[in-house]
Amino acid sequence: MKGTVTVKNLTNKVVKEVHVGLLQFDNKGYPVDVEYSWEGEDNLLNCRMQSANIEPNRSYGSGTYWDLEDQVKKIKACVKSVKFLDGATWENEYFDYWLKAEKSSY
């Protein structure tokens, strides 16, 4: 399966890089663990959109994807952090809450 995520820049800055947490599930909604520990843990895959260069009010991700395990049929995604072109960063303070609430089932 190919996992794709589209993000929209709702700021007035150019987004250089986006870090997305991607939860993987099978066709019955059960978690599918990542194959390699350096990619993530449990069913959380750590994904980066590098050199995205998303201008304000623009979207990015259409036509880009990550190759996922064959048994993955459904995904959930959440932005974990953003790096702006000016060097500033944004961390999603709610990411860990989202992960805890969403990782067990689809």
Where are each of the predicted segments found?
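Short acidic/proline- and small/hydrophobic-mixed sequence motifs that coincide with surface turns
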Residues: K13-E17, P31-D33
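Extracytoplasmic/secreted cell-surface and envelope-processing proteins
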Residues: E91-E93
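Soluble periplasmic/extracytoplasmic beta-strand elements of cell-envelope proteins
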Residues: T6, G21-L23, C78
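Extended low-complexity, serine/threonine- and proline-enriched intrinsically disordered segments
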Residues: H19-Y30
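Asparagine-centered strand-capping/turn motif at beta-strand->loop junctions
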Residues: V7-N12, Q24-D26
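Short, solvent-exposed loop/turn segments enriched in Ser/Thr/Gly
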Residues: M1-T4, H19
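Short, solvent-exposed, Trp/other aromatic-anchored flexible loops in extracytoplasmic proteins
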Residues: P31, E35-T89, K100-Y106
